[in-house]
């Protein structure tokens, strides 16, 4: 056959379009598919079906990827539009009128100021070693003469700038919020402590930097933790553990423990919208609604926190009367603040039944019984309806208002809008609020048991933390003696250590960080509660053992292991061998110990004595002055010369 014959005379069936050079044109992908079909046909069996299924999956996968890309593009465009709208609204709100407000006149205009090295604010060099007097902490640091601007000068400067000036433009030269120092007061006879971003981290750094020829010990509990970690090479290297013959603790180990204690009540889930402190404020506001009659009711969580010194004594008296009239069984160890969890409960967050715990979980909790009687909590899903309330509703023909939901919406609408959770249905918030209330009650009972101006038995002073030069320049030398501040002293039998903490520590911290939790405020309280729970032999994985032999026949519950839930959580945080669920389970076990320990400490007749025993035997705490610092810091150093 001649090569010049045209293609249609070839004895070949034509499947592809002809080419001018008499060559069949076939795409590469088609040839690859033909080869695959031939190989599958030759092999036989189930290969052909597998190849066909792979092709179907690839086709659907391409379609799903295209749909996903389209949805992502649409979402990004929508987000960009919303950001633009918010930016426009902010620009409109920040524009100033021609006549400045009186509040603006009182504020000097922002000027670039020279900052001292390591301070971040002007004039900080006049305050030695991060301490400040109480008067200056409240009224603000004294400005230099060149920085003081009269109100008339401020008006003139504002008028010269023109009506188009904005608040953003005026404050563009202010230091960042993270660099602005804050002031916390712990005891009445010590100056305020100034910090910038991390309160306890900066205290620990200052403490170890000032130590040159001495070191610190923090009690037997910390030494046992060091001894347990020393035998494991990895943790020995991570926490810089050395010198097992003394009680000194490395800075890395101390920061690791404090970080674990701060996160006890911080629940690591994306859908947790409330802190335990905010949940407790909602419960307290609903409980003390009679207190607001004749005065302006609180409209924010910060206002309720300011009323803690008035609300907690009333709550403590009602709890005492409720315990005295208690009917029915009590939890193991006479714990009136216990939760009757199911034996297989591993996670704190209820995952089934519409975020409801097992029926009967709150039956033996004294605060729940009290709130039921006061009408704060009317009905919990899974519990029987109160007959008296049901009869009143039938007779009156109307349902009573849910007091807790009303106050929750009033306090949280500014933060959450319309998505305020209902505590009786999302019961993790109810449980965290009850636990936080128990912690606040314990704080009030313990801190107001004695005055810081009484004769001391301990040797710790603030100079041990920050140096004697810093304390001497801060207002009250030595950190031991000083005049009583008006309204907070121990005269006439009134001890107001807790009131001082609320005003100068809890309130400022919440104003700085509204998401703060009780364990972040008082890691020492969390450590005491966890230690009490571990010493009792209670184990969250063996709840049925605790429920069976706690308070009957004088049975003693033995501790089966020398576990340390704080150390376990430290390992889970820094180890790659733990998955997310396992890490969450370890955190929740620590949280369960914290709840159980708080209940045990509050259920004894004199909580102050039990706390004092724990503090003196394990944490170097000997008096109320040292206890206040331990509760706030989570540790109490004792100086040891090298």
From Swiss-Prot:
Alphabetical GO biological process terms: symbiont entry into host cell; viral DNA genome packaging; viral penetration into host nucleus
Pfam families: Herpes_UL25
Localization (cell): Virion; Host nucleus
S-S bridge residues: none
Keywords on record: Capsid protein, Host nucleus, Host-virus interaction, Viral genome packaging, Viral penetration into host nucleus, Viral release from host cell, Virion, Virus entry into host cell
Coiled-coil region: none
Location of the region described as Interaction with major capsid protein/MCP in the Swiss-Prot/TrEMBL record: 1-48
GO cellular component: host cell; host cell nucleus; viral capsid
Region (Disordered): 97-125
Function noted in UniProt: Capsid vertex-specific component that plays a role during viral DNA encapsidation, assuring correct genome cleavage and presumably stabilizing capsids that contain full-length viral genomes. Participates in the interaction between the capsid and the tegument through interaction with the large tegument protein/LTP.
UniProt similarity note: Belongs to the herpesviridae CVC2 protein family.
Quaternary structure annotation from Swiss-Prot or TrEMBL: Heterodimerizes with CVC1. Interacts with major capsid protein/MCP and triplex capsid protein 1/TRX1 at the pentamer vertices. Interacts with the large tegument protein/LTP.
Protein name: Capsid vertex component 2
Source organism of the structure: Human cytomegalovirus (strain AD169)
Gene (UniProt): CVC2
